[in-house]
Regions:
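Bacterial N-terminal signal peptides that target proteins for export
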Residues: 1-11
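C-terminal motif of bacterial Sec signal peptides marking the signal peptidase cleavage site
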Residues: 16-19
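A short, solvent-exposed, low-complexity linear motif enriched for acidic/polar residues
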Residues: 21-292
């Protein structure tokens, strides 16, 4: 089991005590942070090595809330369909934080740190400026005094993994990250009729609002996430589970061309076999079946 060292500098605690009204009340709160992943079709495994988590208070210097010893190497492809893995569960000074930084070990030419496995071959996976900046989420969070802040970071690998044209064989990770409050998210799940599926690697793209589905190309509408369509061995049905959705309407569209969807270009060959609108509700799983 990985060991987590909590390291809170006195200066950060003092500054946040003042922000919370001094020492007359409860000046700490708990923060829980997990990671999950949206589907990607072309890889057998995507390993990211995390070495710690850093927080930046609104007032005061950043500090490492967790230092992993040894580092934690997590296969993000195992974290789909609502599955997540906890990174930290720690007590910190209550207050507002400007950003969260995930410290990662990901270097060019070194597949023993972070890596991607494709067709059985393992390739280095590196993050530009990863050693200096890590993976930073700048949306900001609030840890309530005497309360619990419970978040999940969603890695969308379909948008994040790129193969540069430098001949090295190293893959680059430019993460598309979503920081989600677990108390505010729900899921949409259901079946996809076998008659709609034209291949073995199909996914359901999820778009915010009522829109016409499009491929991943960096222009709106881009999916906020996607979910793999997998065969349920018990029922024989093809199922998907799109999790960690903020409450509101979404367009869901299955495609069996996701493996060829290049996030850097507009792929006219990505065909959606159906499209339906569903409304996600916090803390609920909404059912939506594609019947053909």
């Amino acid at each position: 089991m990985s060991k987590i060292r909590t390291n809170l500098p006195p200066a950060a605690a003092v500054l946040l005590l003042a922000a919370c009204g001094g020492g007359g009340g409860d000046a700490t709160g708990d923060i829980s942070l997990a990671v999950t992943d949206a589907a990607v079709d072309s890889a057998d495994a995507v390993w990211v090595q995390f070495s710690g988590v850093e927080l930046k208070p609104q007032s005061g210097p950043a500090f490492m809330v967790a230092d992993f010893g040894p580092p934690r190497r997590i296969n993000l492809l195992e974290l789909q369909s609502g599955v997540s893995e906890q990174l930290i569960d720690a007590t910190v000074p209550a207050g507002r934080y400007n950003w969260i930084r995930l410290a990662v070990d990901a270097e060019q030419g070194d597949a023993t740190l972070s890596s991607i496995v494709i067709a059985g071959a393992e390739h280095p996976l590196w993050v530009p400026s990863g050693d200096e900046t890590g993976l930073k989420l700048v949306s900001g969070v609030v840890v309530p005094a005497g309360g619990q802040a419970d978040f999940t970071i969603d890695f969308d690998l379909r948008k994040s993994v790129h193969l540069p044209n430098d001949g090295s064989g190293d893959y680059m990770l430019r993460p598309a990250l979503r920081l989600l409050d677990n108390t505010e998210v729900g899921a949409v799940a259901g079946t996809v009729a076998a008659s709609l599926l034209t291949g073995d690697e199909c996914s359901v793209y999820v778009f915010a609002g009522d829109v016409t589905p499009d491929d991943v190309d960096g222009t709106d509408p881009d999916p906020v996430t996607s979910a793999a369509v997998v065969l349920d061995p018990d029922s024989g049905e093809w199922r998907y589970h799109a999790a960690f959705l903020l409450a509101g309407p979404y367009t869901l569209a299955p495609t069996c061309d996701a493996a060829s969807d290049d996030p850097a270009v507009d792929d006219a060959g990505v065909v959606f076999v159906a499209s339906e609108v569903a409304t996600a509700v916090a803390n609920e799983v909404v059912s939506l079946d594609f019947t053909g």
